[in-house]
């Protein structure tokens, strides 16, 4: 009986510690997403940071990127690996240093991973598209062709 009482007491203590660990859940609804322009991206693209601080090393970052219709994102690389998911619309993506609209437009729910330093580009069809990107900061973008970098214009 003492063993049962001790086991039950320990379970309650451990359970209470896990349940009250100070963490909470942040829920972000679509209407709460705050879109902004980013000088590192071409005009027409909007970005929303949902989780994390892209300037901090080691921080998990989740961002959404909204692309206008009939748009091509120039070839670029990042200093991180990225996990990308199509949230809405249709978008094509490919690897390489020259943008060619070859391949299918991917539908919502499609996802892919680009490794750190991997040159890639994207394009949209007739409609707007939204991607969700997850990476470990710090963020950054380097254009394959420096003339494509809007920060230098």
Name each model feature, range by range.
Residues 18-59, 146-153:
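A short, N-terminal "cap"/entry segment at the start of jelly-roll beta-barrel domains
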Residues 24-27, 101, 121-153:
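Double-stranded beta-helix
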Residues 7-15:
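Bacterial N-terminal signal peptides
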Residues 1-4:
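Positively charged n-region of N-terminal signal peptides that target proteins for export
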Residues 68-71, 77-98:
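Glycine- and acidic-residue-biased ligand/ion/polar-headgroup-sensing regions
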Residues 91-108, 112:
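Mid-chain, well-packed structural core segment of small domains
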Residues 105-127:
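Conserved metal-binding segment of the jelly-roll/cupin
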Residues 51, 61-78, 106, 115-117:
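Conserved short histidine dyad/triad with adjacent acidic residue
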């Amino acid at each position: 009986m003492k063993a049962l009482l001790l086991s039950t007491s320990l379970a309650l203590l451990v359970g209470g510690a896990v349940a009250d660990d100070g963490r909470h859940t942040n829920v972000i609804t679509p209407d709460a997403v705050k879109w902004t322009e980013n000088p590192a991206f071409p005009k027409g693209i909007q970005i929303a940071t949902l989780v994390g601080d892209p300037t901090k090393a080691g921080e998990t970052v989740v961002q959404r990127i909204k692309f206008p219709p009939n748009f091509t994102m120039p070839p670029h690389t990042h200093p991180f690996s990225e996990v990308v998911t199509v949230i809405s619309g249709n978008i094509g993506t490919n690897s390489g240093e020259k943008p060619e609209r070859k391949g299918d437009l991917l539908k919502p729910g499609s996802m892919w991973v680009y490794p750190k330093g991997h040159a890639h580009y994207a394009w949209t069809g007739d409609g707007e598209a939204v991607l969700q990107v997850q990476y470990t900061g710090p963020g950054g973008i380097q254009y394959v062709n420096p003339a494509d970098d809007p920060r230098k214009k």
